Amino acid sequence: MAKVCYFTGRKTVSANNRSHAMNKTKRVAKPNLQKVTVLIDGKPKKVWASARALKSGKVERV
């Protein structure tokens, strides 16, 4: 299973670090994903959920 938020679709993205001389190097920005158990179609299932989804109440834990 890929590390993508089941509810919001948030995932790892690539970005650049920029120095004062505007040199660039690649970096990755990772979301704060938590493994949680939720009810999906009446059955408990473990999925990845972003901390933002958990805080906003989009996720109902078992």
UniProtKB/Swiss-Prot annotation:
Q: Does the keyword Kinase apply?
A: no
Q: Which cysteines are joined by disulfide bonds?
A: none
- Supply the Pfam families for this chain: Ribosomal_L28
User: Mind telling me which GO cellular component terms the entry cites?
Assistant: ribonucleoprotein complex; ribosome
InterPro entries listed in its UniProt record:
Bacterial_rp_bL28 (IPR050096), Ribosomal_bL28 (IPR026569), Ribosomal_bL28/bL31-like_sf (IPR034704), Ribosomal_bL28_bact-type (IPR001383), Ribosomal_bL28_sf (IPR037147)
Q: Which regions span the lipid bilayer?
A: none
Q: Which UniProt keywords apply?
A: Ribonucleoprotein, Ribosomal protein
Which Gene Ontology BP terms does the record give?
translation
Entry GO MF terms: structural constituent of ribosome
Recorded hits in NCBIfam families, A to Z, give: L28
Instruction: Tell me its family.
Output: Belongs to the bacterial ribosomal protein bL28 family.
Instruction: Quote the protein name from its UniProt record.
Output: Large ribosomal subunit protein bL28
The organism that produces this protein has a lineage beginning with:
Bacteria, Bacillati, Bacillota, Bacilli, Lactobacillales
The gene from which this protein is expressed is: rpmB
